[in-house]
Amino acid sequence: MSKVKLTRENIISLLTQAGEIEFEEDQIKATFNFEDFCGENLDSIKKMSITSCLTFLKNRQSIMKVVNLCDFTFGKITIKKNSGRVGANDMTFRRLDSMIRVKLIEETGKAENLAIIKSKIASHPLVQAYGLPLTDAKSVRLAIMLGGSIPLIASVDSFEMISIILAIYQDAKYKDLGIEPSKYNTKEALGKVCTVLKSKGFTMDEEQVQKGKEYATILSSCNPNAKGSIAMEHYSEHLDKFYAMFGVRKEAKISGVA
């Protein structure tokens, strides 16, 4: 009995015909590795400047809507609207987004680039929503990660601890962060990150634990309510007057804001 490729037509034959069918083993065992994918495809975005990468992240949702309208081609890469069964070598919007984040994080290794990224990413909506203080390279790297596919990025060497700590933080603070579980399951995302790390044989030794503590310290200083508090302070004088019209005094800060 000859083995056949795993295709739509052969799956239909498997389900509807009496003949014996087996699929090629090498195709079944083929798995996706984002780190390998990055290595093979980073050249496709090598011309993107730091500013362009940051513009992509800041406008991610709007860009995604345009890209997903139809087959989207840039250079030699095409993101198909209806990809069906996504192959290990196929580009998707999520993979593109993750590659851009990896590229930016690698750029933070240069002091000059770190300063540029730090100054520009501070205005990004998610950074403000998290109330993330940008004090050093690690905090800037966390800022770049916000809104990205953490399980994908976790597969890249040296990105393991930043990924798992951010996933833990999002799961622990999803209510404060305004994350809707029906739209983004933080527990499931954390499970995926752990699965990725286990599959690559990642060992959480003392050095990695120390790195994780540094990221956790930064995230523990986040203030998800800070953006609203700052905005209220901007209108403080007028808000006080309107509160007085209702016979009450405005609270100095939003509940939960230190």
Swiss-Prot record:
Q: Which UniProt keywords apply?
A: Capsid protein, Helical capsid protein, Ribonucleoprotein, RNA-binding, Viral nucleoprotein, Virion
Which InterPro entries did the record assign?
Tospo_nucleocap (IPR002517)
* Protein location: Virion
Q: Does the keyword Lipid metabolism apply?
A: no
Which GO terms label this protein's molecular function in UniProt?
Answer: RNA binding
In this record, what's one Pfam family? Tospo_nucleocap
* CC terms in the record's Gene Ontology section: helical viral capsid; ribonucleoprotein complex; viral nucleocapsid
- Answer whether the UniProt record assigns the keyword Ribonucleoprotein to this protein: yes
Its domain comment says: The N-terminus and C-terminus are involved in homooligomerization and play an essential role in viral RNA synthesis.
Subunit structure, per the record?
Answer: Homotrimer. Binds the viral genomic RNA.
- What is known about what this protein does? Encapsidates the genome protecting it from nucleases. The encapsidated genomic RNA is termed the nucleocapsid (NC) and serves as template for transcription and replication. The NC have a helical organization.
What family is reported? Answer: Belongs to the tospovirus nucleocapsid protein family.
Name of this chain's protein: Nucleoprotein
Q: What is the scientific name of the source organism? A: Tomato spotted wilt virus (strain Brazilian Br-03)
Q: Which gene encodes it?
A: N
